[in-house]
């Protein structure tokens, strides 16, 4: 077990409000570093009713009070795609987020792990979390993709091979010339679904040329 420092902490409109309350119960009034905290209106934007509108307002008010970045209605989007596009995710960084598909960031050579709202509260306050170092499963893609084969097809084939629990307590590491040839969009699809095999993360090769082509990368 190791203590891992967070380069980015993110929560959405489901995990965020719960984390805010848990953080308050901890006795923490401020986040560890506002420049490393992001809130995204992902699940309930645009608001479908008054209750969800109030929830989004609560998130915005909290973010404004903490001085953290908030991607709200009209500025938000699919949280994991958004953070990649906005340049929050860089190779080698560690991202803790209150969503199971945080493994998506492995597409850009980052370690992203999804945590529960109580753990996210601790990350917001302390900027760190405990992590058991996962073992690695090497997934080698050889040859070239055939026409109409997508990144999602590849990861579904992997999950079909190892099963929905085959990656438990592991990281999937995608290697080989087939992995290196994947586009950024394909990498995102492959890494995003690593959790569907129980994996903590799905790491793709960090190739400078393809990483530089990612929208918003800086």
Predicted regions and their residues:
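Fe-S-dependent hydro-lyases/dehydratases of central metabolism
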Residues: 1-218
């Amino acid at each position: 077990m190791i203590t891992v420092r967070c380069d980015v902490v993110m929560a959405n409109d489901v995990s965020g409000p719960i984390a805010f309350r848990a953080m308050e119960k901890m006795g923490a009034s401020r986040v560890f570093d506002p420049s490393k905290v992001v809130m995204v209106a992902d699940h309930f934007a645009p608001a479908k009713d008054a209750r969800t509108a109030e929830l989004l307002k609560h998130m915005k008010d909290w973010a404004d009070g903490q001085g953290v970045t908030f991607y709200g209605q009209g500025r938000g989007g699919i949280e994991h795609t958004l953070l990649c596009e906005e340049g929050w995710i860089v190779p080698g960084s560690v991202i803790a987020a209150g969503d199971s598909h945080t493994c998506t960031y492995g597409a850009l050579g980052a370690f992203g792990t999804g945590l529960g709202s109580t753990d996210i509260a601790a990350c917001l306050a302390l900027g760190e979390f405990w992590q058991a170092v996962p073992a690695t499963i090497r997934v080698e893609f050889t040859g070239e993709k055939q026409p109409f084969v997508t990144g999602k097809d590849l990861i579904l084939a992997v999950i079909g091979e190892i099963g929905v629990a085959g990656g438990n307590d592991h990281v999937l590491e995608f290697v080989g010339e087939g992995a290196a040839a994947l586009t950024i969009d394909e990498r995102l699809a492959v890494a995003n679904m690593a959790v569907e095999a129980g994996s903590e993360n799905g790491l793709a090769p960090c190739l400078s040329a393809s990483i530089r082509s990612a929208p918003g990368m800086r």
